[in-house]
Amino acid sequence: SIVGAFLIMLILSFFSIVFFTIASVFVFAVIIVVIAMPYINKKYNRENKKSDIELYVEQYKNIIIPEFLNQFEEKINYMPNEKIDKTIYDEAEFEKYDTYYSEDVMKMDLNNGFNVIMSDLKTCNTTTDDNGHTHYHELFKGIFTIIEMPKTFNEILYLKKDKKYKRKNIIPKIEKIKLDSTDFENYFDIYSTNSLITMQLLTSDIMEFFIDFQNSTGIDFELTLKNSRIYIRFFSGNI
């Protein structure tokens, strides 16, 4: 069943964090969001009359998910009507935008000291035509996650999409890092305040994992590491 698959994946992901290194927290960031994607599934644009699917999703989110999450020792809170404040999203310096929308918040306080917050999120630019009508141009639509690490990390690292979103992104005013993997650089641009630590974090295994995830899911993602937090966003749309 879907719930059974979710349970197995969640247990495996929690088991893997026992062996955390700083680098493997990247993998955890991907895993924790992937397993939650099917449960963050509310439409952005609602009609006045809810469809059967929307009613099912609403009941599933408000009743089934909270009961299921209560089975774990880790403190996990699912809040479908809460949102992540835009100031937190802005800390990641992903892009400039005009409008911001967030809902479906899930918080996890894990026993190893890592805290995870994720939300369904959307940003847009707005324009006004000659007739005074406002038009919304979508920049990001997907899942945004913050992972708070128990250890202090004072460096800054940005993992930005190489081409597709470059015109929309904020380009960091720090050094662009050149890596050994040409394949990886075809997917991402890396900016960091410390090239040595960047090489230690982005090992060949981690880079291969990111490429495989991108190719197998078709979901673009970007990441910021700063102030002992990992900010990661998945261009997943409505899952």
Predicted regions and their residues:
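Active-site-proximal cofactor/substrate-binding loop regions of enzyme domains
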Residues: S1-A5, V27-V34
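Hydrophobic alpha-helical transmembrane segments
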Residues: I11-I31
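Transmembrane-cytosolic junction motif
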Residues: I32-I64
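Charged, low-complexity intrinsically disordered regions
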Residues: P66, N70-E74, Y78-I239
